């Protein structure tokens, strides 16, 4: 909504990294690679910003509470830019040893980096360690070339393969994004009828 607080659509990806078992670094990297494929498969010429969050080195429990490792944080940010595969191959225990157990949540940054090409330009980097966790802001510009159109078309066919022909079945309506959005609006309207003021407006309009 161009008139809203965000100049575009926001699609959140939530990753649980607090209660174990949590995803591996490699799994989140693969999610990022798949996200890139999905973005490239859109027929529209989209402008997309991929954002990631997660505290750098910190630990908030046990005798190691208050742990901070700014040297590791600097190394992590450098590897994220230049050699992300080194981070992909690390185990959660290695992240915990270097950056604290809660600091292992930086693996979420690998979704963002996985969605970018190998060729990125560092636009901005700043770190600040005010108390029990290091904070960083990092901005990359993706310099990767245009996607291979044959590969994009093959991916589109792959996505549609499982449902191909289902929409032609009589009385069958696959829940597409458009239908889901329409149903959400209807369900929101119906749910809001529990609110007296909304119900009164409905009765008056009816």
Where are these regions (language model features)?
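Short catalytic/ligand-binding loop motif for oxyanion handling, primarily in non-cytosolic enzymes
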Residues: 57-62
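Charged, low-complexity intrinsically disordered segments
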Residues: 151-206
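Hydrophobic alpha-helical segments and helix-packing faces
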Residues: 24, 28-32, 46, 69, ...
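Flexible, D/E/H-enriched segments
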Residues: 1-30, 41, 63-158
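Beta-strand elements within well-structured catalytic alpha/beta cores of enzymes
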Residues: 13, 46-56
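Non-transmembrane, aqueous-exposed alpha-helical and coiled segments at domain scale
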Residues: 33-48
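Active-site-proximal alpha-helical scaffolds that flank and shape metal-associated catalytic sites
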Residues: 2-4, 9, 13-15, 33-34, ...
């Amino acid at each position: 909504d161009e008139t809203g607080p965000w100049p575009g659509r926001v699609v959140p990806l939530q990753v649980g990294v607090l209660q174990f078992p949590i995803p591996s670094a490699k799994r989140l990297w693969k999610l990022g690679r798949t996200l890139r494929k999905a973005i490239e498969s859109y027929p529209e010429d989209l402008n997309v910003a991929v954002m990631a969050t997660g505290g750098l080195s910190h630990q908030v429990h046990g005798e190691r509470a208050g742990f901070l490792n700014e040297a590791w944080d600097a190394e992590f940010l450098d590897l994220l830019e230049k050699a992300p595969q080194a981070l992909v191959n690390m185990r959660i225990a290695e992240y915990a040893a270097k950056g604290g157990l809660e600091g292992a949540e930086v693996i979420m940054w690998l979704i963002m980096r996985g969605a970018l090409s190998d060729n990125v330009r560092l636009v901005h980097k700043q770190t600040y360690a005010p108390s029990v966790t290091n904070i960083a802001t990092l901005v990359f510009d993706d310099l990767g070339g245009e996607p291979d159109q044959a590969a994009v078309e093959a991916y589109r066919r792959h996505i549609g393969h499982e449902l191909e022909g289902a929409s032609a079945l009589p009385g069958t309506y696959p829940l597409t994004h458009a239908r889901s959005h329409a149903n959400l609006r209807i369900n929101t309207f119906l749910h809001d009828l529990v609110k007296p003021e909304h119900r009164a407006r409905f009765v008056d309009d009816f």
